Amino acid sequence: PICMKKWLFLILLFPLTCVAQTYRYLGVEDGLSNRRVYCIQKDKTGYMWFLTHEGIDRYNGKDFKRYKLMDGDVEVNSLLNLNWLYIDQEGVLWEIGKKGKVFRYDQIHDCFNLVYKLPMESFSEQPDPITYAWLDENKHIWLCNKDTIFLYNTETQQVTHIKNDISEEITDIEQIDESHFFIGTEMGIHYAKLENNTLELINCDKLESLKAQIIDLYFDKKIRKLFIGTFLRGIMIYDMNTKSVIRPEQNLKDISITQFRPLNDKELLIATDGGGVHKINVDTYQITPEIVADYNSNNGMNGNSINDIFVDDEERVWLANYPIGITIQNNRYTGYKWIKHSIGNKQSL
């Protein structure tokens, strides 16, 4: 009995750990084609799709499959062709690059087909004529150039040319309703109406006065608020109900905001380049750290440069986390809990 008590005492001196993992990492050693991931999507089958520096990867929860993008016999794999990945309302995957090449995923043949490419002879002096590409709710892909917006209809494959009267480099777009849009640029933000193949700018003093390089926009249709992410100027909110601009007190001014993603009805996740992930309450505008690198922890977050963020149905947060690759945070688990005997405290282990 004395020996047994001695061993029991020694065991209780050692830390006990709860083995539930909060974070999981997917890197090149697991099959990811490149550590630099630009976009994350999830299809209706449940596959995760990653647009990387090398091409497109599909992940089934265990294995990766890499897809090549082909223009005839030539593989399209330069940085100018790997820029945006979208899923439309029918669940079809689209990839678009700054050269204006549009690829559509063919589920039957399990490959990406080139369905449109911008006539590059018109842009001989511009190696990357498209500053931003975007898929709207009206089945159009917007290929935004400083002078022209090319609208590619995903159903008819027809392309409409629209004059870009903003005359600034478009960086992001959010749709308000059938014909109204918020358009972010290198210089600021605009309110516009697209009708009869004409983009009409609508004067909005409060928005026009915001002078900042816009990186990401998120419009919450329920509460009619636009969340504005900038380069080194923090976050701003435009409230359409009160026609006012709000600048939260605790702001992220020294880092670049890369992405907003809804976490729930009341909170948005904010991905940053250098500051990890924060969250903002959509009513109070309080900003708090959510997923930030902890290099001293065995199972903590291990990077703060986040290109994209995706929240799935199981509340897992998928992060494009350079230079790691993909980091998955599972909110349903906590990190390691260290339990150890406190010497002199009879109530402790």
Language-model-derived ranges and their functions:
Residues 1-349:
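Carboxylate-rich, polar loop motifs that coordinate divalent cations or form catalytic acidic clusters
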